[in-house]
Regions:
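Non-catalytic substrate-recognition and accessory regions of acyl/acetyltransferase enzymes
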Residues: 1-73, 83-134
């Protein structure tokens, strides 16, 4: 998959919403890409997986929020980020929104359901994007 258009849309969203231009750091891997944003009020780390091979019960074509910290309005900004993904991600083939080892309780803010209960309280949550009610 060519990720440049999706990253362009994501960068545009971050610029329009928060005023930061071209702030995504993108790392390609065998499963898809990982995006980091560490600027101003934001600390984001998000995986965009095409293939999960069932790891952590995360489905293929998932957006996995690993870290999403905003200094102000945490819940509002997280919901807005999820709304962006719900609208734009299906255009690029993504079908699910998930969290990984969710100590920050993002799943409560987004209404995600438990999909994997691992050892040592490692819980993953997820939901199809079309079922996301935010």
């Amino acid at each position: 998959m060519n990720y440049s258009d999706f990253i362009y849309d994501f960068n545009l969203y971050l610029c329009e919403r928060f005023g930061y231009r071209n702030c995504c750091s993108v790392m390609h891997n065998a499963n898809g890409i990982c995006v980091s944003v560490h600027v101003g009020e934001m600390d984001l780390y998000i995986r965009f997986w095409e293939y999960s091979c069932g790891v952590g019960s995360i489905p293929d074509w998932s957006i996995i929020i690993v870290r999403s910290n905003f200094k102000r309005n945490q819940q509002e900004n997280l919901k807005d980020l999820a709304r962006f993904f719900k609208e734009y991600a299906p255009r690029y083939g993504y079908k699910y929104l998930c969290t990984e080892d969710d100590d920050y309780k993002y799943y409560q803010t987004l209404g995600l359901k438990l999909i994997h209960r691992g050892f040592f309280r490692q819980y993953n949550y997820g939901l199809p994007l079309k079922e996301l009610d935010i």
